[in-house]
From Swiss-Prot:
It is found in: Periplasmic flagellum; Periplasm. Component of the core of the flagella. One of its GO terms (cellular component) is periplasmic flagellum. Glycosylated. Glycosylation is not essential for motility. PANTHER family: FLAGELLIN. Belongs to the bacterial flagellin family. This is Flagellar filament 31.3 kDa core protein. The gene is flaB2. SUPFAM superfamilies: Phase 1 flagellin. Keywords: Bacterial flagellum, Glycoprotein, Periplasm. The core of the flagellum consists of several antigenically related polypeptides. GO terms for molecular function: structural molecule activity. InterPro entries: Flagellin, Flagellin_C, Flagellin_C_sub2, Flagellin_N.
Length: 286
């Protein structure tokens, strides 16, 4: 029997320290709900988890971007609906003026209304804005022979670089849709039956252009709606994968915590018992 080194107490103390450390980690994981709280808990798991978190946030923002794009398209289509209604009215007046029963004075009165409607087409084009950006004046138009200055609307609809799409909106001024002469302020004339007759064909071409643009906007919107669904599903699945890596399994962790708590209590008792054992040496000295 020796008294300088109590090996039983030293062993019990070492094991108790390990158990207390494990118990502290269990408490940390249970209180935070995460099994990876620092790089030391799982270095590779932390790296993968952080990449996934970045991707999840990117996917969520991309979904919001796509939803904002849908709003942009809906606003544009709303303005074009107004322009379409005006064009229908101008066409109706042109058909009316083509009829030979009207006098020149009658057609003059019809022309007054047409002039006001054409001015309204220009007003809509110049005032149609989204977040301060003009939408129908050619800012987002495709490059053509007449229009080489373009700036299509880019919508970033992915979590990573270059995952984006373009939205094009043509010029929808009165001149662009044919109800005002190119290069002048002169309004389409329906002052004579022949003029009114030709105007009907011109207006039909303008309506084709507007309807084509509205159809394009509808296609953009349908695509973006599907994009939002896909992004939301991707974010959800990535979140589930990240949760598997990083989140604590509370039931399993509670089992480990209970085990370590019992071991800590037993270790404390055994350490006390080991210290008592050395005191028995005193009986030999009495």
């Amino acid at each position: 029997m020796i008294i300088n080194h109590n090996m039983s107490a030293m062993y019990s103390n070492r094991v108790l320290g390990v158990t207390n450390l494990a118990q502290a980690k269990d408490m940390e994981k249970l209180s935070s709900g995460m099994k990876i709280n620092r790089a030391g808990d799982d270095a590779s798991g932390l790296a993968v988890s952080e990449k996934m978190r970045s991707q999840i946030r990117g996917l969520n923002q991309a979904s919001r971007n796509a939803q904002n794009g849908i709003s942009f398209i809906q606003v544009s289509e709303g303005y074009l609906q107004e322009t379409t209604d005006i064009m229908h009215r101008i066409r109706e007046l042109a058909v009316q003026s083509s009829n030979g029963i009207y006098s020149d004075e009658d057609r003059m009165q019809i022309q007054v209304e047409v002039s006001q409607l054409v001015a309204e087409v220009d007003r809509i084009a110049s005032h149609a804005q989204f977040n301060g950006m003009n939408m129908l004046t050619g800012r987002f138009a495709r490059a053509t022979g007449e229009n080489t200055v373009t700036g299509s609307m880019w919508l970033h609809i992915g979590a990573n670089m270059d995952q984006r799409m373009q939205v094009f909106i043509g010029t929808m001024t009165a001149m662009a849709v044919g109800v005002r002469e190119i290069g002048s302020e002169k309004v389409m004339s329906i002052a004579a039956p022949d003029d009114a007759n030709r105007a009907i064909g011109t207006i039909d071409e303008g309506l084709k252009k507007i309807n084509k643009q509205r159809a394009d906007l509808g296609a953009y919107q349908n695509r973006l709606e599907m994009t939002v669904k896909g992004l939301d599903v991707a974010a959800e699945n990535t979140q589930a994968a990240e949760s598997t890596i990083r989140d604590t399994d509370m039931a399993k962790q509670m089992v480990d915590f209970t085990k370590n708590r019992i071991l800590a209590q037993a270790g404390t008792a055994m350490l006390a018992q080991a210290n008592v054992t050395t005191q028995n040496v005193l009986t030999l000295l009495q």
